[in-house]
């Protein structure tokens, strides 16, 4: 193998992948969601893979960064951030509101840049690992565990998209406690998951409380989480915490904003987790000093990559704050990257989130598998995954044929297919 680490080519391929009608507080997932697949090719002929959000605002940043990467070594990981700082972000693309593309806190220009940098960093690490014959986790200091545990990600959902749009799947409707328990039983049976997270903020709190209680009865002692994406007021959050405190592992983002979370944390008897009020390093001081969160759900996509995820974990360890991982709709490249970095974090004490079982399509030659709710950490060079070029081309063709409706995530617009009068709800909803 030619060991020349110089970047000779960068390929950016946006794709549209099928997505089920999963409900959240802002609406429902569209029939397809956009992802960006990054291929970095070295002068030595080695290709590294990365993946991130595929909405237009990310593609606009990825293109100039890709051009500037040519001629640099894949080992220059620090240079990625210097390069990103030179890329201008269209102010019209930055909204001072919660980012609907995964409900991951307020959107900022830096977060947009980091969400693109992360894909390039993962691709560089994948290529570097292949050249050196080392798995990505070894480039990060080596694994401290042989497998990474994930949690079943439960959603209220419809049986199909309005009008039968999209590719469809074989999952049933789940809009009540019985439906959620049935969904959880299938996740446990098919993948061996031993902990369960319910995406809330969809129905009135009492209905979601009933669903969590039904899960506790069906799976005695299993770790349970409830995430309403900041849809509740402080009083409602406190009431839910009081009613479910004995069965919840943690309550995730019950209310919006660090001050509200701090209020709930002071009075509730249940730990609070977040992927909304701590999403950048500058947000840490207020959240940690006020005791607003007890667990940070990291996400290498918008934190800026795998090395920054490890930096975040170290800060959390310093302050005695727990750490786990958030998930958005993603494919196997992202899951492989998540698994490698999670394997290197000593203080990872909670099962990570993953949408992956909901995605029936992928760009890999072989899907990653869950056994007993865990993904084995690959010791193969790089990420240990292989790109299926034909499948990538087919999903890219779908993106090309789309009229633009699906290229940017908009859960409220998708909900209007079922409810024409729907608008993004103001928070708190309850």
Predicted feature locations:
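Extended hydrophobic packing segments that form well-structured cores
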Residues: 383-430
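Glycine-rich phosphate/pyrophosphate-binding beta-alpha loops
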Residues: 23, 47, 51-56, 117, ...
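Structured beta-strand/loop patches that form or line metal/cofactor-binding pockets in enzymes
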Residues: 1-49, 53, 60, 356-363
């Amino acid at each position: 193998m030619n060991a020349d680490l110089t970047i000779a080519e960068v390929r950016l391929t946006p794709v549209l992948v099928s997505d089920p009608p999963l409900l959240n507080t802002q609406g429902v997932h569209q029939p397809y969601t956009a992802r960006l697949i990054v291929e970095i090719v070295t002068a030595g002929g080695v290709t590294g893979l990365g993946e991130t959000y595929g909405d237009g605002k990310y593609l606009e940043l990825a293109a100039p960064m890709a051009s500037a990467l040519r001629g640099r070594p894949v080992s220059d990981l620090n240079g990625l951030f210097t390069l990103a700082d030179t890329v201008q972000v269209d102010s019209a693309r930055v909204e001072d509101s919660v980012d609907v593309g995964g409900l991951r806190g307020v959107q900022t220009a830096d977060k947009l840049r980091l969400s693109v940098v992360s894909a390039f960093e993962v691709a560089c690490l994948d290529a570097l690992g292949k050249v050196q014959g080392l798995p990505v986790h070894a480039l990060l200091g080596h694994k401290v565990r042989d497998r990474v545990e994930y949690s079943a990600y439960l959603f209220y959902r419809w049986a199909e998209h309005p009008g039968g749009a999209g590719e469809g799947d074989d999952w049933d409707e789940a809009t009540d406690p019985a439906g959620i328990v049935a969904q959880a039983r299938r996740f446990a049976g098919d993948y061996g998951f031993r902990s369960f997270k319910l995406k809330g903020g969809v129905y009135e709190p009492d209905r979601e409380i009933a669903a969590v209680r039904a899960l506790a009865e069906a799976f005695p002692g299993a770790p349970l989480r409830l995430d309403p994406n900041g849809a509740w007021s402080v009083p409602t959050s406190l009431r839910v915490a009081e009613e479910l405190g004995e069965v919840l592992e943690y309550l995730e983002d019950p209310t919006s904003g660090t001050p509200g979370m701090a209020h709930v944390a002071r009075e509730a008897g249940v730990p609070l987790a977040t992927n909304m009020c701590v999403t950048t390093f500058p947000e840490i001081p207020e959240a940690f000093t006020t005791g607003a969160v007890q667990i940070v759900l990291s996400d290498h996509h918008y934190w800026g990559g795998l090395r920054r995820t490890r930096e975040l974990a170290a800060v959390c360890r310093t302050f005695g704050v727990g750490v786990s991982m958030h998930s958005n709709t993603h494919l196997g490249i992202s899951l492989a990257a998540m698994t490698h970095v999670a394997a290197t974090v000593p203080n990872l004490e909670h099962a990570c989130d993953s949408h992956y079982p909901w995605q029936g399509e992928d760009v890999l030659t072989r899907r990653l598998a869950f056994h007993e709710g865990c993904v084995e950490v690959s010791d193969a060079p790089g990420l240990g995954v292989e790109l299926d070029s034909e499948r990538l081309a087919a999903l890219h063709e779908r993106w090309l044929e789309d009229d633009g409706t699906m290229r940017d995530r908009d859960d409220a617009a998708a909900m209007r297919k079922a409810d024409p009068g729907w608008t993004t709800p103001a928070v708190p909803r309850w």
